A protein has these predicted regions:
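Transmembrane helix-loop-helix hairpins at lipid-water interfaces of multipass membrane proteins
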Residues: 5, 11-68, 72, 145-150, ...
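Helix-loop-helix
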Residues: 44-48, 139, 143-160, 164, ...
């Protein structure tokens, strides 16, 4: 496992400490037997004191090794889990939207949290309880055989029977644990839908339906968990039964051999301790090994994320590196050149043969009916997807030749659903500019008509709940716009970012934006015609195709689709 390679030194030290612990544990029963057989029975006080000192040293080795081994193994497991979690998170940031959708949000949360916690516990328990078993079993049987060959052979047979039972149980448990993880994914998905969509569920009186759906998912998980518990109960019962049988067998065989003067009575105690020690560790190892199939499934799921190749690959060019494409618009910040796009699982193009440019100092608007592909244009500019045909250029360079970091560093984006992160207003604004001063933030808030923040007692330090749920929809949109303005980008994209604003605030905001973005290109994606009336050019989309391109007055005369949208809104009071 590549994540353990970074901790080779810690692994070696941990195993060495555990070895010291096990050696100390194994020495004590033999020393005790020798003390009784040789020292006490003969009254040799010097031997008793000397052997007692050796036992004290061995006990100190075992105790110190156990404490230090627990600490080191816990630290190792936590570090490895942290590295895996960071790697999964970093990989998720590299994935394109289509790559991310292969797993789903619920599954990615499970893989990043629950699965890696399972892996961490498996590493910890394997180091502490499984790895010592082979050494303890072999060494314990050898110690018992050195005391008495017949007793050592008996102990070896008992251990072999227990190991066979463990292998059989683990083989049956593996597929059940695999199913358990898929059920956890389903529970996460259904629970997340119910929590996020609780208002919709209540609005449609679907509480009973959702309760039944949740009950079905929970029941599937519970049924499989019960099967696992049955295996654990069976393993526990059989192991304790075998331990008791082994204890009786050792006492019976040992008693007969003592009666036959083939061994001394204290040796029975030593062999019995070895038997119980080995069988206890074997039993604990069985419990851990039963969970290893689940850990293996979790590791495989994390590996699936780490091994997926992102469909969006960074280019090596930088803006200003070499001449732009011939025939391109020299004034364009962003340009679509006969660009078509189709989703991987689609039969038809979502966008077909788009050609237009967003020029510096101008506002370009995109309008169209729902499903016409307006928001997809924004996602393509941000390179969440790559064009299927044609090209999209940023400052004359094809996006596919640029890195995603460089592209997004030049673009400020306000998404269709304004999302704010938990923290404060200031921390959200600094997403756009980490080095922003208080004056910068106040200016952005003023342009975005978000001065309501200053009316709050804490001002810029006003708390923001996850998703910005402690603000209204219009306030969230204005704060998201202020965050974008902090970036001082070459291209501003507003994806239906004025929909929750009243007409007065909308007009004031657009007027302030004209001055603030005079040196940049602006792309506004909108439903309301009133929002884009004064755009320098308006792109009209229908079913993914450009059916109109021009200013408002021109389109009212030449574009039937645009005229129909405008007239329908005017009749509706807009």
């Amino acid at each position: 496992m590549r994540f353990l390679k970074s901790y080779r030194g810690l692994v070696a030290v941990t195993l060495l400490v555990l070895l010291v612990d096990n050696v100390g544990t194994l020495l004590v029963p033999t020393m005790l037997a020798n003390m009784v057989n040789t020292g006490i029975t003969t009254g040799d006080v010097d031997y008793i004191l000397r052997n007692g000192l050796y036992m004290l040293i061995a006990t100190g080795m075992a105790s110190g090794g156990a404490v230090l081994g627990c600490y080191l193994s816990a630290r190792l497991a936590a570090n490895v889990a942290c590295d895996i979690r960071n790697a999964v998170y970093d990989k998720s940031l590299e994935l394109a939207a289509s790559d991310f959708e292969r797993f789903g949000t619920g599954s990615m949360i499970t893989r990043s949290l629950n699965d890696i916690n399972v892996i961490q516990q498996a590493i910890l328990q394997t180091i502490q309880l499984v790895l010592p078993v082979p050494f303890l079993a072999v060494a314990g049987i050898i110690f018992a055989w050195l005391i008495d060959p017949a007793m050592g052979t008996l102990l070896g047979v008992v251990v072999a029977i227990v190991l066979v039972a463990a292998v059989f149980t683990v083989a049956n448990a593996a597929p059940i644990f695999m199913r358990l993880q898929s059920f956890i994914d389903r529970m996460n998905v259904v629970l997340r839908e119910n929590i996020v969509g609780v208002r919709v569920i209540r609005a449609f009186n679907k509480e009973l339906h959702e309760e039944q759906r949740l009950d079905e998912v929970f029941s599937d998980y519970a049924d499989n968990a019960i099967k696992v518990n049955h295996l654990f109960v069976g393993l526990d019962s059989s192991t304790f039964f075998l331990m008791n049988i082994a204890e009786v067998a050792v006492l019976w065989v040992g008693g007969n051999r003592v009666g036959a003067h083939a061994m001394q009575i204290a040796s029975i105690s030593a062999v019995l301790e070895y038997a119980l020690l080995i069988l206890f560790f074997v039993m604990m190892a069985q419990m851990v090994v039963l969970t290893l199939p689940r850990a293996a499934a979790c590791l495989n799921r994390a590996q699936q994320v780490l091994e997926i190749e992102p469909s969006i690959v960074d280019g090596e060019r930088t803006l200003g590196d070499g001449a732009p494409a011939s025939g391109g618009d020299a004034d364009a910040v962003a340009e679509f050149d006969h660009m078509s796009f189709r989703f991987d699982d689609a039969d038809e193009d979502t966008l077909c043969d788009l050609s237009f440019a967003c020029r510096r100092g101008q506002t370009t608007a995109i309008v169209g009916s729902t499903g016409s592909g307006k928001s997809t244009v924004a996602k393509l500019l941000l390179r969440f997807h790559d064009a299927t045909k044609g090209a999209i250029r940023l400052d004359g360079v094809d996006l596919r030749e640029l890195s995603q970091d460089e592209i997004r560093g030049r673009i400020a984006y306000v998404p269709q659903k304004a999302w704010l992160f938990s923290g404060t207003v200031a921390s959200n604004l600094r997403f756009g500019n980490e080095d922003a001063t208080e004056a910068d933030m106040l200016h952005a808030l003023q342009v975005a008509q978000s001065t309501f923040v200053l009316d709050q007692p804490q001002g810029l330090d006003t708390p923001v709940a996850q998703g910005g749920t402690n603000f209204s929809g219009g306030q969230r949109q204005r704060l998201a716009i202020a965050r974008a303005l902090m970036k001082h980008a070459d291209l501003y994209i507003f994806d239906d970012s004025f929909s929750a604003l009243d007409f007065k605030t909308d007009a004031a905001l657009r007027h302030a934006l004209q001055e603030e973005t005079r040196d940049a290109a602006v792309l506004i994606i909108a439903q309301r015609i009133s929002t884009i009336l004064h755009a320098d050019q308006i792109v009209v989309l229908k079913d993914g195709e450009v059916v109109g391109l021009g200013a408002h007055d021109e389109l009212m005369e030449t574009c039937e689709v645009y005229r129909a949208i405008a007239e329908s809104q005017m009749k509706g009071g807009e």
